[in-house]
């Protein structure tokens, strides 16, 4: 099961938190769709800003968005112009609710699966050999101190007539262990031969239960 399912979804509520945090009764579907549209808009508008995660929290008439990015300067823009434009557009999507955007800097892009996958995809678009792109990314990520990494590319690799998948890994990536902190990210490379899918799994080590959590469980 661990090999097939999205590692983040499998661990939500165990060691990972939800990316959308709010409660609704009647208009649950509308708010869920709103979240989806907001994320899609941010992903398209901030394509080159290395956005790794978008967290959304809602209160009565307010939407708080946390943007995790490796390039905060690009998200904020000159004098805050970019982030203000982003806020205005999201306000329209959110039916006039008050929108607050918080930019969180990602210190090390090589230790975030989504950004590693995007980096490999950009290299593939620049006609770099897929083996070279994967091996270089693996080396850079392992230098950050992670316990293991697994990468996979699928599609017409090197312009081949028949699509295939290739995997490279280093260290350990225990997908079945629920307490294992595994970061998972995907990206797509648009090449002249078609799309190439990129998947990356990073293993950061085990999340051990704290004393407080253990006491709560005992109660």
UniProtKB/Swiss-Prot annotation:
Q: Which residues form a coiled coil?
A: none
Under InterPro entries, the record lists: KH_dom, KH_dom-like_a/b, KH_dom_type_2, KH_sf_prok-type, Ribosomal_S3_C_sf, Ribosomal_uS3_bac-typ, Ribosomal_uS3_C, Ribosomal_uS3_CS
Is Ribosomal protein found in the keyword set? yes
> What organism does the record attribute this protein to?
Exiguobacterium sp. (strain ATCC BAA-1283 / AT1b)
NCBIfam families attached to this UniProt entry: rpsC_bact
Q: State the similarity comment.
A: Belongs to the universal ribosomal protein uS3 family.
Protein's name in the database: Small ribosomal subunit protein uS3
Determine the domain of life of the protein's source: Bacteria
- A molecular function GO annotation: mRNA binding
Q: List the disulfide bonds.
A: none
Record key words, sorted: Ribonucleoprotein, Ribosomal protein, RNA-binding, rRNA-binding
Q: Which SUPFAM superfamilies match?
A: Prokaryotic type KH domain (KH-domain type II), Ribosomal protein S3 C-terminal domain
Q: What does this protein do?
A: Binds the lower part of the 30S subunit head. Binds mRNA in the 70S ribosome, positioning it for translation.
| Gene Ontology cellular component terms for the protein in this record | cytosolic small ribosomal subunit
The KH type-2 domain is annotated at 38-107
Sorted alphabetically, the Gene Ontology BP terms of this entry are: translation
The UniProt subunit note reads as follows: Part of the 30S ribosomal subunit. Forms a tight complex with proteins S10 and S14.
């Amino acid at each position: 099961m661990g090999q097939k399912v999205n590692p983040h979804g499998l661990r939500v509520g165990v060691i990972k938190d939800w990316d959308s945090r709010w409660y609704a009764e009647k208009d649950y579907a509308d708010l869920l769709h709103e979240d989806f549209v907001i994320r899609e808009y941010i992903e398209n508008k901030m394509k080159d800003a290395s956005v790794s995660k978008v967290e959304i929290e809602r209160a009565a008439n307010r939407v708080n968005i946390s943007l995790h990015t490796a390039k905060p300067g690009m998200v904020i823009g000159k004098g805050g112009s970019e982030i203000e434009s982003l806020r205005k557009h999201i306000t329209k999507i959110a039916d006039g609710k008050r929108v607050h955007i918080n930019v969180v800097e990602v210190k090390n892009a090589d230790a975030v699966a989504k950004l590693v996958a995007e980096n490999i995809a950009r290299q593939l678009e620049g006609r770099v050999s897929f083996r070279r792109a994967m091996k270089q990314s693996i080396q850079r990520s392992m230098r950050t101190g992670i316990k293991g990494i697994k990468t996979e590319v699928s599609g017409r690799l090197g312009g081949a007539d028949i699509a295939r998948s290739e995997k490279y890994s280093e260290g350990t990536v225990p997908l079945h262990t629920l307490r294992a902190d595994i970061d998972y990210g995907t990206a797509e490379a648009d090449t002249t031969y078609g799309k190439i899918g990129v998947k990356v799994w990073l293993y950061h080590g085990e999340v051990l239960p704290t004393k407080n959590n253990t006491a709560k469980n005992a109660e």
